[in-house]
Amino acid sequence: LSIRYIILGGSFAIFLDSDHLLQFLDIELVSRMSHSIPFAVIVSIVFFVILRGKDIRICAVAFGAVLSHIAFDIFLADVALNSGTEFPLFSPFTFETVSLQGLDWLGIQIIGVSIVAIVSYFYKRKEIKLKNNLTKT
């Protein structure tokens, strides 16, 4: 991945906590709603539509950034507070929170990195195949 994707993923992962700004303004909302799997899927679809499907890696990076952010929050709660944390992982379908703690962050991080790696591999493979087809004709 290029540095552009790394910066985008990191920025997006930080941007996920912008819901805390709304809480400071006493706006009623479901806390950590952006820390959910449906949100990650929606963000990926939005990027796909905006980019007109030209680069699917951005979609994977966005999805991976949400998972990475969730993993970091779990890691931080475990290391700094010696406790777990809860997320509404399936909001807006259900607002029940899922408790995560300990090494749960590692599994989530591995899933996020794996998604980006697999999508990048297939994207590059397709790109090379197209390039080879163009040079043959």
Regions found by a protein language model. Give the residues of each.
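N-terminal membrane-targeting hydrophobic helices
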Residues: 1-137
